């Protein structure tokens, strides 16, 4: 009887230890940080990240500052590190402003990734990238060229800020493409809405009023593009080409009314999912060097590319770029197929 009891205790102890180990393993936590909360684009990315977390048994926390600031993001990063999160995935408002905090986090063993907007590559392991600057800059100009068929035209650029990494890289490439392929296009102004819906609308209306002969507004920003469309409707400017990047749910009414003929983006829900799957691969010590691939359920295979794809000169082991499989141009024929 005593021997039976000892065996039972041993079995229960082993079961308890196994359960505890499983609990510890399942308790991995990932923080997914946007530039700011309250914007549909970032919310959709967060939804994708949390869906992936549920599928993987990982606790994914979505949180960000109420305004797009380095200090707000640094505070969140530090908080998550102090709470012993295993990985942090951040859409950086600055290429270098977050670097000291991110490097400290990496020194403490936290896996650091970026999504949507990158830091300097030495400040993270992988960037989950919607497209190279050349791809997205070209996409912007091509969408505008579909509507502006004049040799000489006036174009305005309008997006979030002069310091944000991703949009400035795209705009730099777009301006270079205009210079090479549309030398008659004059870029009359470049202005910013600073991720604020009210300010973005005011700025867009100001651009349209200041340039009554404007032919196109290129707005590669989730707040700026709908603001430009709303401004055109408010001021009854029906002959203005408005293109850029935003989510289909936000832009649907403008497309249905014909104010916006086409605009672009990528599947940001997929971007959130891919980010968490890559972070999970790092936490599981799976090989993730340049050339290595990862199969993601419902999405397919993604491959690690060198940082040079983004125009960087920094390469290191365990460091690189994971490109989304595709980008999308939305118009009245396909917009109702998407819900994000």
From Swiss-Prot:
Keywords, sorted A to Z: Periplasm, Signal
Chief location: periplasm
Pfam families listed in its UniProt record: Peripla_BP_4
GO CC annotation terms, alphabetical: ATP-binding cassette (ABC) transporter complex; outer membrane-bounded periplasmic space
Signal peptide: 1-26
MF (Gene Ontology): carbohydrate binding
Quaternary structure and partners: The complex is composed of two ATP-binding proteins (LsrA), two transmembrane proteins (LsrC and LsrD) and a solute-binding protein (LsrB).
Protein name: Autoinducer 2-binding protein LsrB
Lineage: Bacteria, Pseudomonadati, Pseudomonadota, Gammaproteobacteria, Enterobacterales
């Amino acid at each position: 009887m005593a021997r039976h009891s000892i065996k039972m205790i041993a079995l229960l102890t082993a079961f308890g230890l196994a359960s505890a180990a499983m609990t510890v393993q399942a308790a991995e936590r990932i923080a997914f940080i946007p530039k700011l909360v309250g914007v549909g684009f970032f919310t959709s990315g967060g939804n994708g990240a949390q869906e992936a977390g549920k599928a993987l048994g990982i606790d994914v926390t979505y949180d960000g500052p109420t305004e797009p600031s380095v200090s707000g993001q640094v505070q969140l990063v530090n908080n998550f590190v102090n709470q012993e999160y295993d990985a942090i995935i951040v859409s950086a408002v600055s290429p270098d402003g977050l670097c000291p905090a991110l490097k400290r986090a990496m020194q403490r063993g936290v896996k650091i990734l970026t999504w949507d907007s990158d830091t300097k590559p030495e400040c993270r392991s992988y960037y989950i990238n919607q497209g190279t600057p050349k791809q997205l800059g070209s996409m912007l100009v091509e969408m505008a060229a579909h509507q502006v068929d004049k040799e000489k035209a006036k174009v305005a650029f309008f997006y979030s800020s002069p310091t944000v990494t991703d949009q400035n890289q795209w705009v730099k490439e777009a301006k270079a493409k205009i210079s090479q392929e549309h030398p008659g296009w004059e870029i009359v102004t470049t202005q910013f809405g600073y991720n604020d819906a009210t300010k973005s609308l005011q700025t867009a209306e100001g651009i349209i009023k200041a340039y009554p002969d404007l032919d196109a507004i290129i707005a590669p920003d989730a707040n700026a593009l709908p603001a430009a469309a709303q401004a055109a409707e408010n001021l009854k400017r029906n002959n203005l080409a408005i293109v850029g990047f935003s989510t289909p749910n936000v832009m649907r009414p403008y497309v249905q009314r014909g104010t916006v003929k086409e605009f672009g983006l990528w599947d940001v829900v997929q971007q959130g999912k891919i980010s968490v799957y890559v972070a999970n691969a790092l936490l599981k010590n799976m090989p993730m060097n340049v050339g290595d691939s990862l199969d993601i359920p419902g999405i397919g295979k993604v491959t690690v590319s060198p940082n040079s794809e983004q125009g960087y000169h920094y390469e290191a082991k365990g460091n690189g770029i994971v490109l989304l499989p595709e980008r999308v141009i939305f118009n009245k024929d396909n917009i109702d197929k998407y819900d994000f």
